[in-house]
């Protein structure tokens, strides 16, 4: 099945301004300022709720796989920072296929159009109409503009026939599930059996169905609790999505009253062989440090290895560890403002190696630019392939008195002591996705299982923060750009000086953001995310202490992180808690962040159990108040870790008598619905509910 460019016409639009008619997006003319569609200025004000859109009608029904946006030949503030794309067979029935934003540059950008409607895997759907809804330009006071749109996909009869068949099967299955769920809710299990036999489906005697039968139909709460403990718990653990498991819990280890002072721009790595953390350099706002510290985790003790020796003062450098060879590699330095009229005489990139066993620093190069490596750089990316003995360096700002200049991608062979600059090409299908390795303040992580480099985030030439990500297949030097999923709220904001950790065992990257760009503003706002390599999705995680209002790390950037992934611990130290260049707020706090991979399951099981016991408590309140209080004290308080306020509120509620007149059957069903909402069910789960009635009411 051949993918090709799909022809279309302009079907309708919300508005347009002056000569900027929607028909202009049919022609790619990046050097013509008028060759674009712009919505009417008076209509597209932020406080106006009227939706702006343009609808494209394809010449033929087709599986639309992706959409390409052309741009003006220079960055333009009218480019779309946020937009949604819908698609479908009919104008009145279209589904969201993409939510994304364009980078404010001159490069074309291509995005996949897909939907998770017919199965768990994202697929393209057959469309006759495509609707583009602009939401925001790169500047609020400017019109929202689209310069050019190209659609690509497959319109062969065989492909459409196969898609239609899958669509019909999926809709039929959903219809059956709705019927089964409704009749189970009404207690008509004989009708459920007839439907299942007619379609040759197995009868769903799942723990959830048995629990519903015991709880809602028979009213046996004690039996329901036993069913939950003996059967449903195991099913929850098996079905729970891995990406919904993880939380962090922070613990402050120490504040440095002596020794290590406040700083940012320092580097920190963890060595599993000796269970120690190695920290080098940094800046306190006035002084640049050359101190080298070792933290012994077992002894909870910091030891200064050297204070004024080699490799010397530095900040915004990078340091990585090769645990197999027990070597540290250190590169880069920030010498002052990149706008100085002259390059400082010591602005060279010296490259150092530290032998952990011998505790000796060795200079591998006094000027890497003369040895085939990068020029004097800072805020670059650095990672190591321990198996092959290669250190990779990407981006970073070079010293230039006139403009920001960024480096490319380099590899250093630690065995042969040789630098090599790597040329990267892009996959044919992504030839218009020109990911720029040349950036600063970004992250780069090496993924050993697939011999790939992941590069994301940082700052571009125009000093805008970026989030785009690509991975580089090192065997072929081929780059593939990762495209954010349909909802931009499901990915981090563009950021600078974020910190990342590769967890290769679990195929994920932990990233700690702090200095983010929200719309046109750059703000300090903490956020923790995991990028799952297998599913190519970002998932936001949280610090439990922050959720509970307890002590936790504040917003920061330029901090240092290191991870002991064998014990599921991330260490965090220092950073800058202010974005004001003249009023920096350097930090000296030291934190341990425990990675709780099973927190989601435990939280779910605890909440389900609590709901059942609360229902039993309210049943006893209606029958015998003394027994209810005894049940709370002996069966609930020892099992659930709740505050005195929680238990006091239950007692007061019991004595108020508000539950005595409530219909017991209705209360059981409400409790079951609360439990159902907590469970990791999917669209194939048959669970008793009355959603069928709601659907009929909605469509009639």
Swiss-Prot record:
GO CC terms of this entry: cytoplasm
Record's keyword terms, sorted: Kelch repeat, Repeat
UniProt entry tagged with the keyword Repeat: yes
Gene3D superfamilies: Galactose-binding domain-like, Kelch-type beta propeller
Pfam families: Kelch_KLHDC2_KLHL20_DRC7, Muskelin_N
Stretches forming Kelch repeats: 276-322, 327-381, 390-439, 452-499, 508-558, 569-619
InterPro entries named in the record: CTLH_complex_component, Galactose-bd-like_sf, Kelch-typ_b-propeller, Muskelin_N
Transferase is among the record's keywords: no
Extra information: Transcription is induced by mei4 transcription factor.
PANTHER family: MUSKELIN
Name this polypeptide is given: Mei4-dependent protein 6
Organism: Schizosaccharomyces pombe (strain 972 / ATCC 24843)
């Amino acid at each position: 099945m051949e993918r090709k460019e799909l022809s279309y016409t302009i079907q309708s639009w919300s508005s347009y301004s002056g000569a900027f008619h929607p028909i202009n997006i049919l022609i790619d003319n990046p050097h013509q300022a008028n060759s674009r569609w712009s919505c009417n200025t008076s209509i597209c004000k932020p406080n106006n709720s009227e939706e702006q859109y343009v609808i494209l009608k394809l010449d033929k029904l087709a599986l639309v796989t992706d959409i390409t946006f052309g741009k003006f030949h220079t960055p333009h503030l009218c480019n779309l920072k946020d937009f949604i794309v819908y698609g479908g067979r009919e104008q009145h029935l279209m589904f969201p296929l993409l939510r994304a934003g364009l980078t404010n540059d001159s490069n074309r950008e291509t995005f996949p159009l897909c939907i998770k409607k017919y199965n768990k895997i994202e697929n393209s759907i057959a469309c006759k109409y495509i609707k583009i809804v602009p939401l925001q330009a790169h500047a609020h006071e400017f019109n929202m503009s689209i310069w050019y749109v190209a659609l690509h996909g497959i319109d062969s009869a065989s492909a459409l026939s196969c898609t239609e068949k899958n669509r019909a099967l999926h809709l039929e299955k959903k219809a059956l599930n709705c019927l089964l769920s409704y009749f189970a809710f009404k207690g008509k299990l004989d009708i459920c059996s007839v439907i299942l036999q007619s379609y040759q489906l197995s009868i769903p005697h799942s723990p959830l169905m048995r629990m519903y039968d015991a709880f809602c139909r028979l009213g046996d709460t004690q039996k329901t609790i036993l069913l939950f403990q003996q059967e449903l718990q195991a099913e929850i653990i098996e079905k729970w999505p891995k990406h919904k498991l993880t939380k962090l819990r922070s613990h402050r280890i120490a504040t440095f009253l002596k020794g290590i002072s406040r700083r940012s721009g320092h580097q920190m790595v963890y060595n599993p062989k000796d269970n120690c953390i190695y920290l080098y350099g940094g800046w306190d706002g006035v002084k640049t440090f050359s101190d080298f510290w070792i933290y012994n985790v077992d002894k909870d003790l910091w030891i200064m290895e050297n204070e004024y020796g080699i490799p010397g003062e530095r900040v915004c450098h990078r340091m990585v560890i090769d645990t197999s060879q027990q070597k540290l590699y250190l590169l880069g330095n920030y010498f002052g403002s990149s706008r100085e009229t002259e390059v400082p005489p010591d602005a060279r990139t010296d490259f150092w190696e530290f032998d952990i066993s011998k505790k000796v620093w060795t200079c591998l190069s006094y000027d890497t630019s003369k040895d085939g490596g990068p020029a004097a750089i800072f805020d670059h990316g650095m990672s190591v392939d321990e198996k092959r003995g290669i250190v990779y360096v990407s981006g970073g700002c070079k010293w230039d008195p006139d403009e920001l200049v960024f480096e490319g991608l380099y590899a250093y062979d630690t065995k042969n002591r040789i630098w090599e600059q790597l040329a990267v090409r892009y996959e044919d299908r992504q030839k218009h996705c020109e990911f720029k390795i040349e950036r600063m303040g970004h992250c780069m992580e090496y993924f050993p299982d697939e011999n790939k480099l992941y590069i994301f985030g940082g700052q571009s030439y125009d000093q805008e923060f970026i989030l785009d990500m690509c991975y580089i297949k090192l065997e072929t030097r081929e780059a593939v750009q990762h495209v954010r999923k349909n909802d931009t709220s499901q990915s981090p904001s563009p950021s600078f000086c974020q910190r990342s950790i590769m967890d290769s065992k679990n195929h994920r990257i932990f990233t700690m953001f702090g200095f983010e760009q929200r719309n046109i503003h750059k703000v300090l706002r903490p956020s923790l995310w995991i990028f799952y390599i297998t599913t190519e999705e970002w998932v936001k995680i949280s610090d439990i202490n922050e959720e509970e209002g307890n002590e936790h790390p504040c917003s920061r950037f330029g901090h240092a992180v290191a991870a002991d992934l064998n014990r599921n611990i991330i260490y965090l130290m220092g950073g800058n808690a202010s974005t004001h260049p003249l009023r920096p707020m350097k930090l000296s706090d030291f934190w341990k962040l425990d990675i709780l991979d099973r927190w989601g399951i435990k939280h779910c099981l605890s909440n389900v159990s609590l709901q059942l016991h609360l229902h039993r408590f309210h049943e006893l309140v209606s029958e015998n108040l003394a027994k209810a209080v005894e049940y709370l004290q002996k069966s609930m308080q020892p099992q659930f870790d709740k505050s005195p306020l929680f238990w006091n509120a239950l007692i007061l509620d019991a004595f108020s008598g508000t539950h005595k007149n409530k219909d017991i059957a209705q209360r059981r069903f409400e409790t079951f619905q609360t439990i159902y909402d907590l469970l990791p069910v999917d669209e194939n789960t048959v669970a008793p509910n009355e959603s069928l009635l709601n659907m009929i009411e909605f469509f009639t």
